[in-house]
Amino acid sequence: MSVAFAAPRQRGKGEITPAAIQKMLDENNHLIQCIMDYQNKGKASECSQYQQILHTNLVYLATIADSNQNMQSLLPAPPTQTMPMGPGGMSQSGPPPPPRSHNMPSDGMVGGGPPAPHMQNQMNGQMPGPNHMPMQGPGPSQLSMTNSSMNMPSSSHGSMGGYNHSVPSSQSMPVQNQMTMSQGQPMGNYGPRPNMNMQPNQGPMMHQQPPSQQYNMPPGGAQHYQGQQAPMGLMGQVNQGSHMMGQRQMPPYRPPQQGPPQQYSGQEDYYGDQYSHGGQGPPEGMNQQYYPDGHNDYGYQQPSYPEQGYDRPYEDSSQHYYEGGNSQYGQQQDAYQGPPPQQGYPPQQQQYPGQQGYPGQQQSYGPSQGGPGPQYPNYPQGQGQQYGGYRPTQPGPPQPPQQRPYGYDQGQYGNYQQ
């Protein structure tokens, strides 16, 4: 019991010195040993008492660590050894012995429950895993980090979704772009798109991002695009992020889009790569955004796009995209989109607002790239929503034209990518 009380006394002293901390750690070791002994003896009550004491010590240490980060320097060496035990023992009545060996981890995880984590924080280095994790954030922290950046992309996607965000996303975008890729996937996936998002939007995009991964390049591109996009930023980023991811994301993003997204996924994957280089053609506008040309068009469009609503601007943009940045694209798009789709497009665009105009486009060419026939069909579907009326409008036509564009898309995209 003396040991048991020693810790409390130590706490009472409130001495925050390496010696005091070491003493407490030693006490924790003794407590752990006692707990182990009692466990072996089957004395649960004593074990629980010591565990409580150990827990309090750990909490105390954690508090000290929080208040005095210098503790980290103090704790690391000795504490690592003892601490681990302490937390371990504390955290686990049964496993103390093993915990002792792994205790730190166990602490982090189990034991010390709060204290352990804190301690870990203190120890930080010692409990790297937990510490960082905790520090960073939950498991996701990694993701989070990426996510954050990634998220941004999402957000951009999200933005895409709502150009609104896109603006912010544009800001975040940069980061996002970078991360986007990497994290995008995880985040994206999980991210409930909206929320994964560390930035909400991004989340969704995120998961589109995963697709993005392919886009990773684009993200890179996007990033550089970002610069460009910054202005268009809204769109641009969005586009990049979204589009880049966009297509993919959009698809997911588009989830509404229904099938296409998935198909898109494939397409996106598939042309995502193309795009990815291209900056992801997907967004035609994006391409433009990405691509300086389109970029310019897009730029206007984006603004207009966002401003006007995805509808007309979109249409315009789409045309712009196609016409401008994506002249080639434009052609194809025009070809496939232009004639029938564009007509449909306006409506579609209107839908775009919801859909994110370019999503449609992305999809549009996404599909074009994605899978000429089937995907296009899907594409219409995906766009269908975007195309919404559009698809309905020209279920057949879009596809055929799309397919033509499809060739364009890819070829052009390839160029763009290049």
UniProtKB/Swiss-Prot annotation:
Residues 77-120, 193-418 are annotated as: Disordered. Sequence repeats lie at residues 344-356, 357-369. Residues 309-318 have a biased composition (Basic and acidic residues). Keywords: Acetylation, Activator, Nucleus, Repeat, Transcription, Transcription regulation. Residues 394-403 have a biased composition (Pro residues). Pfam families: SSXT. It is found in: Nucleus. Disulfide bonds: none annotated. GO terms for biological process: cell morphogenesis; chromatin remodeling; cytoskeleton organization; ephrin receptor signaling pathway; intracellular signal transduction; microtubule cytoskeleton organization; negative regulation of cell differentiation; neuronal stem cell population maintenance. It comes from the Eukaryota. The modification N-acetylserine is found at S2. GO terms for molecular function: transcription coactivator activity. Appears to function synergistically with RBM14 as a transcriptional coactivator. Component of SWI/SNF chromatin remodeling subcomplex GBAF that carries out key enzymatic activities, changing chromatin structure by altering DNA-histone contacts within a nucleosome in an ATP-dependent manner. This is Protein SSXT. It comes from Mus musculus.
